[in-house]
Amino acid sequence: MIKKNKEELNDMEYLVTQENGTEPPFQNEYWNHFEKGIYVDKLSGKPLFTSEDKFESNCGWPSFSKALNDDEIVELVDKSFGMIRTEVRSEKANSHLGHVFNDGPKEKGGLRYCINSAAIQFIPYDKLEELGYGDLIKHFKK
């Protein structure tokens, strides 16, 4: 399982996960990344999203239509910056991940999880078994 301690986070990872920051759009690791695999919480290593549910939203951040397991995600009301939004945090590490909006693809349920790349780590499909995520292979189309 992939995971980090808070002390191992770089400045952007710390800003995003611990201080509820937001990385720049279109200037982050996964905004246009569509390789087959899963995305895990950078701190706890818990699986959060799959490439099967990732889509291009043109917002500049990785976007997913659903979480892999709702039990790994916590949603909170966020009233910062004069807006009312739904913040998404990881349940295990309590890291800020991003926000969820109701403007996603209707055919996939209508949600858009807008997630900071700095809060997640990508695990390629062909490494799932080796890195302890083999039980998640069932979530992928053959």
Curated annotation (Swiss-Prot):
GO CC terms in record: cytoplasm
Annotated TM spans: none
Active site positions, chain numbering: C114 (nucleophile)
GO molecular function: peptide-methionine (R)-S-oxide reductase activity
Reactions catalysed according to its record: L-methionyl-[protein] + [thioredoxin]-disulfide + H2O = L-methionyl-(R)-S-oxide-[protein] + [thioredoxin]-dithiol
Residue ranges annotated for the MsrB domain, each copy included: 2-125
Key word Oxidoreductase present: yes
Pfam families, alphabetized: SelR
InterPro entries: Met_Sox_Rdtase_MsrB, Met_Sox_Rdtase_MsrB_dom, Mss4-like_sf
Source superkingdom: Bacteria
Keywords, comma-separated and alphabetical: Oxidoreductase
One GO process term, biological-process aspect: response to oxidative stress
Enzyme Commission number(s): 1.8.4.12
UniProt cross-references to HAMAP family, sorted A to Z: MsrB
Family affiliation: Belongs to the MsrB Met sulfoxide reductase family.
Record PANTHER family: METHIONINE SULFOXIDE REDUCTASE (PTHR10173), PEPTIDE METHIONINE SULFOXIDE REDUCTASE MSRA_MSRB (PTHR10173:SF59)
Protein name, as recorded: Peptide methionine sulfoxide reductase MsrB
Annotated organism of origin: Staphylococcus epidermidis (strain ATCC 35984 / DSM 28319 / BCRC 17069 / CCUG 31568 / BM 3577 / RP62A)
Lineage: Bacteria, Bacillati, Bacillota, Bacilli, Bacillales
